């Protein structure tokens, strides 16, 4: 364990006090909203509609960041508030109750499958190095989400969820598995 009691740099950020948890909760939700705003803005942009490859890459990055943030929320707090999209201007979808995490995973899987199709491999494009979200990272995150959705995340009482393990996602039909099997 880390002797640093003022930071949250331990393995998987397990050390936290009440202030730290509140800050983390707010910052992760801020990331989901910012990523959702980016996804919405990119999808509605003229450049994306005209087939800009850069906008396609940016969409993949935004989808990945949104999925990563929601997975982190679910991993840390279980059932959380979730919305698929941006906040309405009248704020009617801002203050929402939490929903079952098993209802969130299909959205994350859908987003990650789209992100995998949008992103390049590391080194495939000039500025896409290990410091950018790449196809390899997106495939790894998709696999992690699939594990959690299939029941890998243990629930209260150390029992697996009632989730259908075979359902998330069918790896043989997953576009990312072609490279893995070769």
Predicted features and spans:
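Conserved, well-structured interaction surfaces
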Residues: 2-77, 92-128
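Short coil/turn linking the two alpha-helices of tandem helical-hairpin repeats
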Residues: 74-81, 123, 148-157
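Short linear capping/connector segments at secondary-structure termini
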Residues: 85-92
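Amphipathic alpha-helical protein-interaction segments enriched in hydrophobic
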Residues: 131-141
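Eukaryote-biased recognition of long, low-complexity, charge-rich segments
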Residues: 158-177
């Amino acid at each position: 364990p880390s002797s640093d009691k003022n930071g949250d740099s331990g393995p998987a950020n397990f050390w936290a006090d009440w202030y730290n948890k509140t800050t983390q909760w707010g910052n992760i939700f801020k990331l989901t909203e910012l990523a959702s705003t980016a996804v919405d803005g990119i999808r509605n942009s003229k450049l994306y509609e005209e087939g800009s490859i850069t906008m396609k890459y940016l969409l993949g990055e935004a989808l990945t960041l949104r999925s990563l943030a929601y997975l982190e929320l679910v991993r840390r707090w279980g059932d959380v508030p979730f919305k698929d999209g941006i906040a309405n201007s009248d704020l009617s979808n801002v203050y929402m109750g939490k929903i079952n995490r098993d209802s969130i995973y299909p959205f994350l899987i859908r987003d990650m499958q789209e992100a995998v199709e949008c992103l390049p491999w590391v080194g495939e494009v000039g500025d896409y190095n290990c410091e950018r979200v790449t196809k390899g990272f997106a495939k790894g995150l998709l696999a992690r989400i699939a594990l959690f959705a299939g029941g890998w995340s243990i629930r209260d009482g150390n029992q697996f969820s009632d989730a259908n393990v075979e359902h998330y996602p069918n790896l043989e039909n997953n576009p990312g598995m072609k490279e893995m099997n070769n």
